[in-house]
Amino acid sequence: MESSKTFMRQMPITPGYSGFVPYLSCQGTSSEDNMANCLKIFQENTRRCKDQLEEFHCSVATAPKLKPVRSEGTVLRTLHQYYRQYHPLSLECKNIKKPLHEPPIPGWAGYLPRARVTELGCSTRYTVMARNCYRDFLDLMERAKQAHLKPYEKIYGVKSTPPPPTPPPKVLLHEGLLPKYPDFSIPGARCPTLSRALMEDPRPLMTCGCPQRPSVWCSGKIYLEPLSGGKDMEG
């Protein structure tokens, strides 16, 4: 393949030319003689670089080919397996998690654990550093799982006071039928709205001379008995 020819302006330059001239800014004056000298130096340097580039291309083309470390089939098979298992755009639903000990993708410059706080990344290749960092990180995780965790009291010598026991719930035993309105039979309880004891009756007390019944307390307050069944009403 023939290389493209480099454009070279022919000497002498047209009188009155005021365009860019290489190396002219390094000269003290901008006369026509200095302009011709600058163009001549530029043409020689350009031709020399062009010859060196062609010589390099020839040496690369004639160099002996190196033997591959792995066959092309092995490389393609490995890439296909990696693509099938770990590619993020795969549409299959897999529960396979990428292991930590696998080296990252070439060119990946993400976070590596234990890379900046240890000497594992000194004077090694990136893949070797990544493998060592992940291995050390996994070892730390395994040791942390197997270590015996001491309680807080043993480490700092603090005696923890047990929480107070929960009091048992109060069970109120009532005999007979219970009304559906709030329970006013708790002694000593007060109503937050009326600001008086719940057992206190604002009406004047009614007393009678009849003999005491179970529904009448010794304090003289009269309480109605619950209604009995239909048989009692008929009788």
From Swiss-Prot:
Keywords: Cell projection, Cilium, Cytoplasm, Cytoskeleton, Flagellum, Nucleus. InterPro entries: SPMIP5 (IPR043246), SPMIP5_dom (IPR055215). It is found in: Cytoplasm, Cytoskeleton, Flagellum axoneme; Cytoplasm; Nucleus. One of its GO terms (cellular component) is nucleus. Expressed in sperm. The keyword NADP does not apply. It holds the Pfam family SPMIP5. Microtubule inner protein component of sperm flagellar doublet microtubules. Microtubule inner protein (MIP) part of the dynein-decorated doublet microtubules (DMTs) in flagellum axoneme. May serve to reinforce and thus stabilize the microtubule structure in the sperm flagella. PANTHER family: CHROMOSOME 10 OPEN READING FRAME 82, HYPOTHETICAL PROTEIN LOC681006. This is Sperm-associated microtubule inner protein 5. It comes from Bos taurus. The lineage of its organism: Eukaryota, Metazoa, Chordata, Craniata, Vertebrata.
